[in-house]
Regions:
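Patatin-like phospholipase
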Residues: 1-62, 66, 110-112, 117, ...
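Surface-exposed patches in mature extracellular/periplasmic domains of secreted proteins
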Residues: 3-6, 80-90, 140-142
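Residue-level detector of alpha-helical segments with a strong bias toward transmembrane helices
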Residues: 19-23, 70, 144-146
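Hydrophobic/aromatic-lined pockets within catalytic cores
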Residues: 24-25, 76-80, 113, 134
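Residues that form generic nucleotide/phosphate-binding pockets
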Residues: 34, 71, 75, 128, ...
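Long, well-ordered early-domain segments
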Residues: 53-85, 89
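Active-site gating loop/helix substructures
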Residues: 88-180
């Protein structure tokens, strides 16, 4: 595991992938005690029912998935993607969530964030994991702000690529260039 350069996860798999990326292989055996053996669902419910969180949940800008991200933040030591990039000996992390508007995957990657003119480095790892793990109806969707049009679009959306998969990717990428 010490030779792994990239770890990725989607849905529940993103929880352990992010743990490995933030803490490395030496601490991986502790994951069972720190997460798997905890009644995370009950802890999340108790956390949601705290008076301050009940008030926050009434806000249109704060949802149940934000509470999940807050609870996961302690598991990852409040790490951001920028923190991960600066660590030596830890693998890169790729978390994939679902773009509900397109029905496709949304990668928490520099390339994807470049498309929406946003900065992945400042995003908490827990936020990406919550976005990936959010089960519709049980947890609220996580919304990212699209700043398209406020930066130069990346080269990937040019017309130079011809193969089928690349055309599909290019069309998906172009959809992010419209911030409306």
């Amino acid at each position: 595991l010490d030779k792994v350069d990239l770890v990725g996860g989607v849905s529940g798999g993103s929880i352990v992938a992010a743990y490995f990326a933030t803490h490395g292989s030496a601490r991986l055996p502790r994951f069972e005690r720190e997460y798997l053996r905890q009644d995370f669902q009950e802890n999340l419910l108790s956390y949601a029912l705290r008076p301050g969180n009940l008030v926050a949940l009434s806000s249109p800008w704060f949802g149940r998935s934000h509470l999940l991200a807050e609870r996961l933040d302690s598991l990852y030591g409040a790490a951001t993607f920028g923190d991960l990039a600066s660590r030596k000996g830890h693998p890169d992390l790729l978390i994939t969530a679902t773009d509900m508007s397109l029905g496709t995957g949304f990668e928490f990657s520099k390339a994807q964030f470049d498309l929406i003119c946003s900065n992945l480095q400042s995003v908490p790892v827990s936020f990406a994991v919550a976005a990936s793990s959010s089960v519709p109806l049980l947890l609220s969707p996580v919304t990212l702000r699209n700043f398209a049009g406020q930066c130069e679009p990346p080269e990937v959306v040019g017309d130079a690529w011809e193969d089928y998969r690349t055309r599909l990717y290019r069309e998906q990428a172009r959809s992010y260039l419209d911030s409306n």
